[in-house]
Amino acid sequence: MTEFDVTDGVHDVIEDTELPRRLKDEVLATAEERGVTKSQANEIATAVEAQYLDTRVDPLDPVGTVSAQSIGEPGTQMTMNTFHYAGVAEMDVTQGLPRLIELVDARKTPDTPVMEVYLEDEYAEERERAHEVVWKIEATKILALGDISTNVADMVVRIDLNEDTLQERWPRVDSTTQIAGEVAETIEGNLGVTVTQDGTILEFGPSEPSYRELLQLVEQLRDIVFKGIEEVSRVVIRREETERGEEFVLYTEGSAFKKALKIEGVDATRTSCNNIHEVHKTLGIEAAREAIINETMTTLEEQGLDDVNIRHLMLVADIMTNDGTIESIGRHGISGNKNSVLARAAFEVTVNHLLDAAIHGESDDLDGVIENVIVGKPVRLGTGDVDLRMGATQTSD
C-alpha cells in the first residue's frame, strides 16, 4: 500500500507510466476517490499518458518564435487605456497593453502598485476586525487626525486631535489621551521639537522665534506618517466570495509587500502584490516567476484573451528569471545581452551594436534564428537542423 488508499496493482500500473510526479499523484488521488480496479487504472493511465506525450514539444520546435507570435498577435487587440479595477470604486489600475509592457520591461515600480490582501480567521469575517488591519496598513498622516493652526504671536503650532476619529481608528486603545501621547512622540522624533500635551491638544514651536521656521514646521508636519505603511496611500475593503466562503479582502493603492505580510491578521499565504520586484525581494525568484506568469495571464484574461496557452507565458517568465534575477526583455536586458552580434543589432540601435562589435573584434557563430535569416542561411531549427543520410546495403548477385 502507498500514501494513497489504492491496491498495489493499481499503484504499480500508474507508477510504470512516463508521467511526471505531479500527474502521477493526481491520477492516484483520482483512483483512490473513485475506487477503480487495476484494469480501469490501466485504461486511465494509458489515456493520460497518451495525452501527456501528445502535449510535449517536438525536438527542434521553434518554441520561442511560436511564443512570441502567440503573445504578440493577441497583444494587437489589447487596449491602451487604464481602467478602474473591476468592482472597486475609484481605484485605477493599469491594464491592457501598458500593463503587459510594464511586465516584460520588468519596471522597478508599476504605474499603479497594488496589493490584494487576504485576512485570517476573525479578521476575514468581522468588518470591525478587518478595519483594524486597514488602519495598520493605510498610511495615517497626523493631518488626518485633527485640526492644525498656527499662533504667530506665540510662535506655536497647535494640533487639536479629533477624539471621534481616534476612537474610530483605534477602538481597542484605552484612552484617546494615550494615542495623543504617541502622536506627540512621533512629532518629537521627526521634527526634533518639544511637544506639550493637554489631553488631545498638542503644541510645539521652533527653538528660536522665527516665522520662517514656524512655517517650515507646519510643512514638515504634513508629511509625517503616524501609523500604517508610508507607501500605501489608501485601502479599499470589499466582501468577496472566495474558495473559503464569503470574507473581507483588502485592496491597496501603493505597495510594501514585505511590511504588509508582517502585520497581524494578514494571511501571508494568499496575499499578493503586482510589483514583481517586491515579490522577488520578499519571497525569492521562484515566487517572482509565478507572479510574472499570473500577472501576465490576468492581464490577457481581462482583455478577453484567455485562450493564450499559459506555456507561452511560462517560457517568457523562465527566460526573464533564468539567472536568479529579473531581467527585462529589451535592449537593456535579454535581447541586448545575446551572444550574436546580428541578433543584437536587429533588435534596436543597430549602428551602435555593429560599431561596438567591430571595435572589439567580435564574431557571430550564426546559431540563432535571426542571424541566419539576415544572412540568408537555413535556420537551424526543425528540418533545418537535421542531416539526412541515405543508407545503402550491398546485395549479392
Curated annotation (Swiss-Prot):
- A Pfam entry, by short name: RNA_pol_Rpb1_5
What is the protein's given name?
A: DNA-directed RNA polymerase subunit Rpo1C
Question: Is Cell membrane set as a keyword in this record?
Answer: no
Q: How does it assemble?
A: Part of the RNA polymerase complex.
Organism, scientific name: Halobacterium salinarum (strain ATCC 29341 / DSM 671 / R1)
The entry's keywords: Cytoplasm, DNA-binding, DNA-directed RNA polymerase, Nucleotidyltransferase, Transcription, Transferase
**Could you give a GO molecular-function term held by this entry?**
DNA binding
Q: Where in the cell is it found?
A: Cytoplasm
Query: What gene name does this entry carry?
Result: rpo1C
Please name the NCBIfam families in this protein's record: RNA_pol_rpoA2 (TIGR02389)
Q: Which class of enzymes does this protein belong to?
A: transferase
